[in-house]
Swiss-Prot record:
It is a single-pass membrane protein. Keywords: Endoplasmic reticulum, Fatty acid biosynthesis, Fatty acid metabolism, Lipid biosynthesis, Lipid metabolism, Membrane, NADP, Oxidoreductase, Transmembrane, Transmembrane helix. GO terms for molecular function: ketoreductase activity; very-long-chain 3-oxoacyl-CoA reductase activity. This is Very-long-chain 3-oxoacyl-CoA reductase. PROSITE patterns: ADH_SHORT. Belongs to the short-chain dehydrogenases/reductases (SDR) family. It holds the Pfam family adh_short. GO terms for biological process: fatty acid elongation; secondary metabolite biosynthetic process; sphingolipid biosynthetic process; very long-chain fatty acid biosynthetic process. It comes from Neosartorya fischeri (strain ATCC 1020 / DSM 3700 / CBS 544.65 / FGSC A1164 / JCM 1740 / NRRL 181 / WB 181) (Aspergillus fischerianus). It is found in: Endoplasmic reticulum membrane. The chain crosses the membrane at residues 26-46.
Amino acid sequence: MEFLSKYTACLSNWGLNLEPGLQTVGAAVLLTTGSLFIASRVLTFVRVLLSLFVLPGKPLRSFGPKGSWAVVTGASDGLGKEFSLQLARAGFNIVLVSRTASKLTTLAEEITTKHSVQTKTLAMDFAANDDADYEELKAIVNGLDVAVLINNVGKSHDIPTPFALTPEDEMTDIVTINCLGTLRTTQLIIPGMMQRKRGLVLTMGSFGGLLPTPLLATYSGSKAFLQQWSTSLGSELEPYGITVELVQAYLITSAMSKVRRTSATIPDPRAFVKAVLSKIGRNGGSPGYAYSSSPYWSHGLMAWFLTCVMQPMGKLVVGQNKSMHEAIRKRALRKAEREKGKKST
């Protein structure tokens, strides 16, 4: 809308200030420019629709033969658990990495019971950033044909909180888990992929990395970092035949999002992971972001609108995002007060 108003004003000025012959030329130039701009937006939207609803992604078997392995971080719950189950169903052996050993054991048993694949587990707290943990992970994957890496481990704020009030340990954990944990794991896995000239490195991003998110500033910044890092990595590894993809996601029902009810815009992990794995290599709703995708249909449409129509870094979008998270914070604080009152009675 802002473009059209500027376009109209510019056209009016040309009409006022130029000779009649030049007015015609000027109007034609502006009309052509405007038409090309609108046509490019329409074509981009058509590409988005084709990517989301028609065109298939790369087959998972293109990343590794039967008997190859997938490493999944944050594997014990939510998206990580679902990635593990669906990759096992596709015939991959699974290395499960997460913090809680008992949950990993239960999931490993579920996978081997349902599917004829092998599993390995590692109970690892990414917040600790312990060299010994990474050495143990290296020992586990050494000699394995790791075809797929799912960087799913992540942490957000307990509730939306102004940066000045964010607890230091929460801030440190978010950066250590989301950024450093992802980098160290990836750097450990990709040499084998580079040797074999194939592989998939898939990292879970967030709309928080696309849109500055007040009251989730540290989390938003960590996901923006992953966006830039993953896109750069995609360019570096493409000559080795490795597909790198950052998945831009809106809300999904999970412990992290604290959303329990599904809707058109909030899928459950099963539906979301199915969309991700069926659209590898397709941009979905993120045509302007190389080596990135927003593959779930409603998330893709939102991502297209926010990045191709709106100005994601503009004050309007940031202000709306701030208002939304201020309201969420107020509700969370009221709920905490009610629960505190119940405990004291």
